[in-house]
Regions:
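Generic structural signal for well-ordered alpha-helices
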Residues: 51, 75-82, 117, 144, ...
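Residue-level marker for buried hydrophobic side chains located in beta-strands
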Residues: 29-31, 155, 231-232
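Divalent metal-binding pocket/active-site signature
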Residues: 91, 99-192
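Active-site-adjacent C-terminal substructures of enzyme catalytic domains
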Residues: 165-290, 295, 302-306
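C-terminal cap of metal-dependent C-N hydrolases
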Residues: 301, 306-322
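Divalent metal-dependent hydrolysis catalytic cores, especially in the metallo-beta-lactamase
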Residues: 36-40, 48-77, 85-97, 124-136, ...
Length: 322
């Protein structure tokens, strides 16, 4: 059987060879739970541009990830985004490890405080859907428990947690690891967040761009956690744009050959992926069924939503929303 489509809508099934559709794939629309921007803008300074950039590459549902800022700036950003065409907001900071802060300003990091978190949630009026915490920080476990009780997805990451601290975070309600194998001890390290994450039932965000995770590590991760991977972009503003100088928060970023790094360093500063890129990369590495799982089904499970609410068609890297 084949699919027949008209005016970008599926209108029936037909015999193979009779289809008027020339699409390579028809799949559930992509869900990106970790993305900062695109099209030369961040969600915080050009939400419509960032949203449309990723929508044009097949992303049906987006969560806007915010890097570490001072609290007043963070509140202003939350207010500016809570009524945009987004599923919600992900606070990637400020409750993360200084050792593994990556492209977050180390001078703005904070320890988790439930009263402070309650204030941020109040400002968001239901728009904050996810928060990343380093579980080894003082107050982190109590914060994880509180957030989970409010229905907020808790991710652990940017972290130097040991095995015991990771297990306690899982028990408190953490369900996701933020960009696994980045900004934490690498796989193979004993008594680490990575060791427990591979063995446990956490969903593992993975940036498959050829730079964030070495090929050998990718295959090891996929073999040990084949059904728990979540494709993300972690896209920064340069996605869909040319190489050059950019910013993440107050930090300077240089993009060269589509690879973003903090200027003058080898520290990666997000990616320039779209979810279409991620889908095609996973399709090449592990196959079609798992690529669909990682780009649509697993992120939908994390968010507790229907992964089949919208479909896209792909032909020669061009996406049509069905």
């Amino acid at each position: 059987m084949a699919i027949s489509a008209q005016y970008s809508y599926i209108n029936g099934l037909c015999a193979l060879g009779e289809s008027n559709s020339q699409y390579d794939y028809i799949v559930p629309g992509f869900i990106d739970i970790h993305c900062h921007g695109g099209g030369g803008k961040y969600f915080t300074d050009g939400a419509m541009t960032a949203i449309s950039t990723h929508k044009s590459a097949g992303t049906r549902i987006q969560i806007a990830s915010l890097v570490t800022q001072n609290l007043e700036t963070l509140k202003e950003q939350i207010i500016s985004l809570k009524n945009q065409d987004l599923f919600g907001i992900h606070l990637e900071g400020p409750y993360i490890s200084k050792k593994y802060c990556g492209a977050h300003d180390p001078n703005l990091l904070r320890t988790p405080d439930i009263a402070e978190i309650r204030e941020l949630l109040a400002v968001g009026e239901g728009s904050i859907k996810m928060l990343t915490i380093a579980p080894e920080l003082p107050g982190a476990l109590q914060a994880i428990d509180y957030l989970a009780s409010k229905g907020i997805v808790v991710a652990i990451g940017h972290s130097d947690a040991n095995a015991s601290e990771t297990l306690l975070a899982m028990k408190a309600g953490a369900t996701v690891v933020t960009h696994f194998n980045n900004a934490m001890a690498k796989i193979g390290a004993s008594d680490s967040i990575s060791e427990i994450a591979l063995k446990g039932n956490l969903f593992l965000e993975l940036i498959l761009d050829g730079h964030h995770v070495k090929s050998a590590d990718v295959f090891s991760i996929l073999s040990k956690a084949p059904d728990r991977i979540v494709a993300i972009t972690d896209a920064m503003s340069a996605t869909g744009c040319s190489d050059g100088q950019y910013k993440i928060g107050a930090l300077d970023v240089t993009v060269s050959n589509n690879v973003a790094k903090l200027s003058g360093t080898n520290t990666l500063a997000g990616s320039t992926l779209t979810m279409l890129d991620a889908f095609l990369n996973f399709n090449k590495v592990i196959g079609f069924e798992q690529a669909v799982r990682y780009t649509s089904l697993n992120p939908a499970k994390i968010l507790g939503i229907n992964p089949y609410a919208g479909y896209i068609a792909i032909k020669d890297r061009v996406v049509t929303h069905l």
